[in-house]
Amino acid sequence: MKFHFEKILPGPGESFVTEKMTGPTLDCVYHVHPECELTWIESGFGSRFIGDSIEPFSAGDLVLIGGSVPHHYLTLESDSTGPEWSKTCVVKFSPAFCGRTFLELPEFEAVSQMLQEAERGLHFPEESAAEAVPLLQKLFRENGARRLLALLELLELLSRLPRRTLSGSAIRPEAAPDERLNRVLRLIHRRLALGRPIPLAEAAAEACLTPTAFSRYFRRATRKRFIDYVTELKLSRAAGKLARSDRPIVEIAFESGFYNLSNFNRQFQNSRKMTPRAYRNSYRRIDLQHAAP
């Protein structure tokens, strides 16, 4: 699998990178880097792609990925109108940032195990994220040795918190970047933002391949059929809209690229193991719990 390779360069006197990103959208190409990455979404919503996983994200989302895991966060323009911009905190660190024998120490066995699991991507549920975020924010405030100690403290805490894996398997990309794949993905995302269909023939033309050759290429590159990838992305968009609005389900289905409500309900049930209405109600229960004194 080929993706854009990102080179991570810590600043002077630093062994790892911290970044805060603010703007109307998050739109990065599929990329990889040898460093582990911890990403917290302070505000904003969209779709995240970790290995072969496609899921919606919203404020509070906390994900840890291992080195060389293909990933991509996307907020589409139509999802980012108004004052709610995306705010994201990212920490990128080498597993050997404390020395190559660090993870072999018995005191950090749980951390080592967690970083191995992170090769498939790890999502921390809301309760876990809420417990970890204060330490993450502390990390961004510290300097020097205190900054390093804050990262160690954060990783130790995360190793004890509930989490779930995202990708069905660990995916190892090829070293060479593939701009052709990113061109196709940008086309897909633009079309979904406009609510327009994406014919396979047009995607194939963007990649300068015949439809048959493109189908083989896309499946080899993403481990998904083209139609399955597009469907999962549309379902991810629909899930995000269901969670944060009371608009009619049929309207959300149409906006997300499903022009038959029965087909949308069936696809959503197969993907999320619940109906769109039940999915929306599950988020309402969470909101009510948070609103309770």
Could you say what each language-model-derived stretch is?
Residues 6-10, 69-138:
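A hydrophobic/aromatic-rich effector-binding and dimerization subdomain
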Residues 56-73, 151-158:
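Conserved long hydrophobic alpha-helices within structured protein cores
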Residues 108, 114-120, 126-173, 179:
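An amphipathic alpha-helical interaction segment
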Residues 138-146, 159-167, 176, 183-199, ...:
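Basic, amphipathic alpha-helical hairpins
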Residues 172-175, 189-190, 196-236, 253-282:
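Basic/polar phosphate-binding segments, predominantly the helix-turn-helix DNA-binding elements
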